[in-house]
């Protein structure tokens, strides 16, 4: 077994796929601090403009949100102490779920420890070997893992290909229980799903629709998500979203009708068998949610800025795929090239993610740039760095 592990690790290194943790001292804010090894036992801490974090609205630095989190620690301590169904529940949790359901305009909601835990619970609880789940090929790994754990028939349709989805639904039309699952914003491409067509097919074939709004929550639809932006929120059965991205905190929610939420509370293993979130996190989630409700225009400001940056990158000759959101891929192709580009941009003071297979398909390695509301005053510096990258021919 150890020889097998060593062989696999060597293969990762040879293919520029070996991953290590960056020496980051602070990584959520406007600037990211990274410890650089200078050799001979010497290190240097450098500061970069943070274009890699999912803290899209910069809410982690909003004083009223930080104060709410700190107050909860002082009042309730640092841990919940148990799972929700034992003693890990408290009033802040109940308020967060009530406010979340009101915000999402659903009957009820349930808070989970992470988006991964939420998707694993949803699919493993609702689907079984008699269920057919139709899933976009670029859906997040948590959706895929939830489907696999459920034992359901996992039927993947080509990314955003409605004709392929329709053909597969027709082929499997006799399946009694059917689910269509999709991200609304795809995390590595920054494009959006064809939700109206998906909903119409789901209704025609009697399928349940589940959407993952992780990268749309807080931004689209006055912060409510892409389904609300498209005016389809009442035609979607289950909405999942996170507090760990635009809301600047941690954890996730599922919003749906009361029966579905009651069922997940009783059958969602990742919910039942996890210690609940600590008071500091729940209070931050609640404060962030209220902040977005009161500042619902900030998502549109972010999208307008991202649109301007994307158009300028395209003018330079960069391939940004089908992005129409705050996530902008710069597709370079090979693993080696994308790693070189990342290092080049770091020399210019810009930190972006270098995304390689298996996260993205082979030969589509890319820089993943996430536009953030709190870095817009640095836009020209960012664009100048990309102009220099293009001129360098990397």
Per-region residue spans from a language model:
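PLP-dependent enzyme catalytic core of the Aspartate aminotransferase-like
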Residues: 63, 67-71, 75, 98, ...
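Active-site C-terminal subdomain of aminotransferase-like
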Residues: 205-208, 215, 219-324
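N-terminal "arm"/small-domain region of PLP-dependent enzymes with the aminotransferase-like
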Residues: 2, 6, 13-76, 207
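Active-site phosphate-binding strand-loop segment of PLP-dependent enzymes
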Residues: 55, 155, 159-211
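Conserved N-terminal alpha-helix of the aminotransferase class I/II PLP-enzyme fold
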Residues: 66-114, 306
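Conserved PLP-binding catalytic core of the aspartate aminotransferase-like
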Residues: 300-307, 314-349, 363-364, 371-373
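Conserved PLP-anchoring active-site segment centered on the Schiff-base-forming lysine
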Residues: 122-141
């Amino acid at each position: 077994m150890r020889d097998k592990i060593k062989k696999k690790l060597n293969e990762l290194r040879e293919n520029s796929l070996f991953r290590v943790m960056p020496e980051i001292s602070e990584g959520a804010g406007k600037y990211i601090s990274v410890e650089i090894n200078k050799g001979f036992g010497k290190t240097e801490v450098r500061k970069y403009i943070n274009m890699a974090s999912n803290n899209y609205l910069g809410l982690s630095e909003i004083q009223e949100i930080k104060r709410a989190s700190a107050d909860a620690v002082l009042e309730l301590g640092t841990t919940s102490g148990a799972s929700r169904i034992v003693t890990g529940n408290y009033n802040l949790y109940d308020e967060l779920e009530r406010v979340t359901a009101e915000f999402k305009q659903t009957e009820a909601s349930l808070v989970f420890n992470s988006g991964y835990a939420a998707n694993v619970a949803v699919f493993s609880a609702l689907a079984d070997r008699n269920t057919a789940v139709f899933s976009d090929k670029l859906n997040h790994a948590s959706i895929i893992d939830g489907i696999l754990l459920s034992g359901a028939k996992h039927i993947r349709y080509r990314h955003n290909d409605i004709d392929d989805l329709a053909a597969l639904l027709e082929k499997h039309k006799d399946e009694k229980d059917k689910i269509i699952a999709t991200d609304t914003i795809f995390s590595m491409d920054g494009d959006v799903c064809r939700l109206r067509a998906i909903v119409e097919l789901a209704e025609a074939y009697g399928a349940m629709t589940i959407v993952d709004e992780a990268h749309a929550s807080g931004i689209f639809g006055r912060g409510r998500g892409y389904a609300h932006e498209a005016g389809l929120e009442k035609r979607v059965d289950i909405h999942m979203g996170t507090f760990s991205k635009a809301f600047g905190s941690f954890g996730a929610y599922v919003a749906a009708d009361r029966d579905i939420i009651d069922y997940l509370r009783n059958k969602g293993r990742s919910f039942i068998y996890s210690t609940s979130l600590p008071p500091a996190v729940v209070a931050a989630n609640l404060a962030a949610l209220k902040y977005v409700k009161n500042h619902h225009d900030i998502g549109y400001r972010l999208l307008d800025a991202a649109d301007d940056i994307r158009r300028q990158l395209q003018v330079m000759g960069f391939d940004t795929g089908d992005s129409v959101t705050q996530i902008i891929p710069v597709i370079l192709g090979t693993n080696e090239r994308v790693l070189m580009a990342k290092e080049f941009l770091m020399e210019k003071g810009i930190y972006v993610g270098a995304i390689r297979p298996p996260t993205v398909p082979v030969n589509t390695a890319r820089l993943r740039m996430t536009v953030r509301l709190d870095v817009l005053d640095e836009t020209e510096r960012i664009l100048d760095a990309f102009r220099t990258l293009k001129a360098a021919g990397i």
